[in-house]
């Protein structure tokens, strides 16, 4: 691919990446609000679970969220810059060392729990309090 084509492609991708989501990593518990179209109406559906993996590839970036629904593990891959994602909220920060948490698929119950990163939680709380003082 020529340099001109790469430049045009990079400019197009930069224009498509419109909004910023909050920063989250593997092990974090997030709530992803997804736009769901049913017939002629649209509603927002919440999907809460643990981020088990992320893929950072510019416009093709994605993240995988795993939750337990009625005793079964359900995983869903979301495109980071997709129009169907309404918002993402980080509920709690997990403390993990692995890049991909695929080992959670084989664990059940208490074994599948992830320790909370208390330092990150304290920083987030301080940031929220500072923002509240500004308002």
From Swiss-Prot:
Transmembrane segments: none
Gene Ontology molecular function: structural constituent of ribosome
Claim: NADP is one of the keywords in the record: no
Gene Ontology process terms (BP): translation
Keyword field contains Magnesium: no
Domain of life: Bacteria
Job of this protein: This protein is located at the 30S-50S ribosomal subunit interface and may play a role in the structure and function of the aminoacyl-tRNA binding site.
Protein name as catalogued: Large ribosomal subunit protein bL19
């Amino acid at each position: 691919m020529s340099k001109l084509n790469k430049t045009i492609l990079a400019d197009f991708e930069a224009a498509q990446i419109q909004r910023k989501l909050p920063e989250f990593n593997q092990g974090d518990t997030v709530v992803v609000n997804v736009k769901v179209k049913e017939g002629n109406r649209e509603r927002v559906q919440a999907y809460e679970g643990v981020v088990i993996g992320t893929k950072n590839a510019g416009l093709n970036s994605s993240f995988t969220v795993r939750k337990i629904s009625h005793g079964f593990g359900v995983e869903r891959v979301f495109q980071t810059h997709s129009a169907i994602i309404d918002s993402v909220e980080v509920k709690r920060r997990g403390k993990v060392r692995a890049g991909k948490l695929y080992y959670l698929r084989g664990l059940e119950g208490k074994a599948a729990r992830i320790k909370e990163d208390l330092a990150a939680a304290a920083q987030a709380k301080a940031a929220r309090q500072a923002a509240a003082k500004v308002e």
